[in-house]
Design a protein with these regions (language model features):
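Glycine/small-residue-rich loop that forms an oxyanion/phosphate-binding "nest" at active or ligand-binding sites
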Residues: 55-86
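N-terminal glycine-rich anion-binding loop in soluble enzyme alpha/beta folds
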Residues: 1-57
Length: 86
């Protein structure tokens, strides 16, 4: 079954764990949801340069998710959104 992939574009596993807990109630609808941390990302995204630096590794991470039905970028400003749509 295809899954919804939520990508935390920073490298903070604790942030990803919080996101995973927040989306947990949505799993009751039967759609598998996987939350991933971008290990190559900065610890936090506080500038445009940091946001831009996440794009290439996020595209690689997304491409590796062969069962993804869709993606959510779990970050204010949606870094890489337009690149991920291509």
């Amino acid at each position: 079954m295809s899954s919804l992939v939520v990508i935390n574009p920073n490298s903070s596993q604790s942030v990803t764990d919080g996101i995973d807990a927040a989306v947990d109630p949505l799993r009751s609808f039967g759609v598998p949801i996987r939350c991933l941390t971008l290990a190559e990302g900065p610890p936090g995204i506080e500038s445009q340069m940091q946001a831009d630096q996440t794009i290439a590794p996020m595209l690689a991470l997304a491409a590796a998710q062969t069962d993804a039905a869709g993606y959510v970028i779990a970050c204010f400003g949606d870094p890489g959104l337009h690149a991920l749509r291509d």
